Amino acid sequence: MLNGQVTLVTGATRGIGQAIALELGRQGAVVAGTATSEAGAQTIGAYLLAAGIKGAGFAMNVNDAAQVEATLAAVQKQCGDIAILVNNAGITRDNLLLRMKDEEWDDILSTNLKSVYRLSKLVLRPMMKARQGRIINITSVIGVMGNAGQTNYAAAKAGMIGFSKSLAREIGSRNITVNCVAPGFIDTDMTRDLDATQRAALIGQIPLARLGAVEDIAGAVAYLAGPAAAYVTGATLHVNGGMLMD
């Protein structure tokens, strides 16, 4: 149980982020979830309230350094020092490299990777002072195996893994762990938009013969956030139905 530990989950409006926020809340965490808009923040606040979870939603653009700093200050004031950070916010801008525009590359690296640097850096001091903390980064199977048309996304997600291993070595002596969860193909709004042929092709690559559920990812995050994972750091937990085995 997480016993009132303040948890920040970015990109928590729906899908994987929402499932993580709800699961950590059920485990006893106080949950601060972020969205890109005030409407999204209200959505987060509403579902936390409906589930009987203590916490709130906050509007935050992870690419705006000043806004990120102000939001974390607001979370600290309203909820307390952040003990668990889940870097989940992410976007896609798929294109073949020959056709990729600079902004498609830059948008992905900024949102998916630089935000992890920015948020992790800001939560470190209170975690170091408390001599405990958990940073959990949501990467992707694509960051390990690659995918045509996603050089930008794969680079960002692979970068998250390298970042996490390096930071784990820097701050392990302060009892702060840094780990990744790497989802495979998950049943979300994006995969539901695929036609039957595309879905069948995806499922054909997965030994468990189904798409993952958002709850599968939330359960992995809850494990890494909880006491059972106190001796786990610098690891990447693959949750992909056997699509990638290492």
PLM feature spans:
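Conserved glycine-rich cofactor-binding loop
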Residues: 6, 13-15
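Short, small/polar-rich loop/turn modules that mediate ligand/substrate recognition or access, typified
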Residues: 172, 177, 232-234, 240
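Substrate-binding pocket helix/loop in short-chain dehydrogenase/reductase
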Residues: 96-97, 101-109, 191, 202
